[in-house]
Every structure is written in structure tokens, then in C-alpha cells.
Amino acid sequence: MEPGPDGPAAPGPAAIREGWFRETCSLWPGQALSLQVEQLLHHRRSRYQDILVFRSKTYGNVLVLDGVIQCTERDEFSYQEMIANLPLCSHPNPRKVLIIGGGDGGVLREVVKHPSVESVVQCEIDEDVIEVSKKFLPGMAVGFSSSKLTLHVGDGFEFMKQNQDAFDVIITDSSDPMGPAESLFKESYYQLMKTALKEDGILCCQGECQWLHLDLIKEMRHFCKSLFPVVDYAYCSIPTYPSGQIGFMLCSKNPSTNFREPVQQLTQAQVEQMQLKYYNSDMHRAAFVLPEFTRKALNDIS
């Protein structure tokens, strides 16, 4: 393993042993994901979390927060494109967008591609994640240079309390429900987002994995249905997330919203112009087709 620009690679963080990074977590017990490391690029502890970046043998640069992979250059586009386009293409005219989290810049990159979007506010509590991403994940962080962006380094909770009835779409790109991020999976957080949305507003949040967190997803869906007239759940595949999948919880204040049929259908020319690699209108529809065990658990009987 080569030395990196921020110092020698050895001994490196504890998660890297004999040239391999190994991800383990109490949220997915009994399983692990390993990636071969070519070079340790960055390892520091910010005010909020441990930040690690390494160049992998087959997945490009990898961002790890508190020992958990957040994104890799090879497969990040599937998650970023879906969490952004599922809500944006379900809204007839999304002009004002709020992003909570997403310090790597990937969601922002996708949001600003939409011509209808006039302004984006992003709230990221950890400025170090933004700076590290600009340095080591430039293909994701490119959105930070957009003239549509107002960047707020601080607490998204407090920001939304002060900005009610303000946004057409809110996207929460959170880490897993541990530590500070745990509050982003609670009913009180969804209630706060509801007040920050305009009367026909839509939200989309990282919704964990159906293979690992079905009870949590069911709980979230239950309280969301008490807050919003329209609630749905979708998912996509992404190799370096736990069990190779990640889900999305979508809610709308507009009773006529149908998440399963995009109101904005992209032509092939638009897909190519937006440089999309995963999302298209057919993939949008397919994302809501759940396997039988998930459909039953969520009582998703149409």
C-alpha cells in the first residue's frame, strides 16, 4: 500500500489490515464488506466523526465515515441519481430544493441538473466532509460550484425550524441510524420536514435496506402515513452498500401524487444530456416494485 498525500499509509486506521479495508457494523451483524486498498489518502477525526478516504483497487476513491462506506467513485451514481430524481421527477415543477446532509456533493450534483430547479439550499453539519470530498471526490463535489447553491454549514433541524412552507422538495441524504443520524429516522424529523415543505411539497429520505432493516422501514412507513396522504418506498442496487441495496422513503403533501408514475418523464435525449448512468423513467417505475416479503411486511397491497 502506497503512502498518501496526507501522510504515510502505515499503520493507518484499524479497519485497514494487510492491505484490505473491512467494514463491520452492529446494524448489519454477522456480515462484512472488504475492499482492497491501494493507497490511504486521508484519515482525520473531525469535530463530528472519523473521516477516512482511500483509493481502492477496483472501486476508485472511497469515502468512509465512522467505519462505514458512504460512497465509492465506481457505484455512487446509482444512489445519488435515484434519491434526487425519484422526488424531482414526481413533482410537476420543483423550483426550490433543500438537501439535508450529502456533504460529498453527489445529490447536489444531480439536483442542479434539473432546469426547473432555481435554488438549492444544502445543510451539512460537517464542513470537513465537504472539503475532503472536493479534494478526493471531485466528480461528486462538482455541484458545490453551482450558482444555484446556498450552502449552510450547520444543523438542518434548526434551519428547517426557521424556514417553514419554503421548499418544493426536501432530500435527506443521511448516514445510517447511529449516533447523531439516528434522529433523522424519527417521526419528529419527518414532522419538521412537513412544516418546511410547501403545500404540495415532496420529500425523499435514505430509507435503509429491506434485507437488514425491515422492522425500521415498517415503523417509518407507519408514522409517515400518519403525517402525509401519500407515502411510498423504493429501492436501488448499489454493490458497496450493506447487502447491495438501499431504499428510499418518499412522502408527499399533495394527495394526488403518484410516485410510481413519474410526472416528468425523461426522453432518451434528456437522460444523455443529464449524463445519467442509472436513472431513467422505466427505472423509476421499477424501483417501487417490491419483492413479496417486503410487500407483505409493509402491507403494500394494491
Swiss-Prot record:
Example of a GO biological process term: spermidine biosynthetic process
**Catalytic reactions of this protein:** S-adenosyl 3-(methylsulfanyl)propylamine + putrescine = S-methyl-5'-thioadenosine + spermidine + H(+)
Pathway listed for it? Amine and polyamine biosynthesis; spermidine biosynthesis; spermidine from putrescine: step 1/1
Matching InterPro entries: PABS, PABS_CS, SAM-dependent_MTases_sf, Spermi_synthase, Spermi_synthase_euk, Spermidine_synt_N, Spermidine_synt_N_sf
Where are residues bearing N-acetylmethionine located in the sequence? 1
Q: How is its activity regulated?
A: The activity is thought to be regulated mainly by the availability of decarboxylated S-adenosylmethionine.
Domain of life, per UniProt, equals Eukaryota
Q: Looking at its record, which EC class is this enzyme?
A: transferase
What's a Gene Ontology MF term here?
A: protein homodimerization activity
Q: Does the keyword Cytoplasm apply?
A: no
PABS domain residues are 18-253
Indicate which residues the UniProt annotation says bind S-adenosyl 3-(methylsulfanyl)propylamine.
49, 80, 104, 124, 155-156, 173
Q: Where is the active site?
A: 173 (proton acceptor)
Task: Decide whether keyword Transferase is in the record.
Answer: yes
Keywords attached to this Swiss-Prot or TrEMBL record, sorted alphabetically, are:
Acetylation, Polyamine biosynthesis, Spermidine biosynthesis, Transferase
Q: Where does putrescine bind?
A: 79, 173-176, 241
> What is stated as this protein's family in its record?
Belongs to the spermidine/spermine synthase family.
Q: How does it assemble?
A: Homodimer or homotetramer.
Q: What is its biological role?
A: Catalyzes the production of spermidine from putrescine and decarboxylated S-adenosylmethionine (dcSAM). Has a strong preference for putrescine as substrate, and has very low activity towards 1,3-diaminopropane. Has extremely low activity towards spermidine.
Name the UniProt record assigns to this protein: Spermidine synthase
| Biological source species | Mus musculus
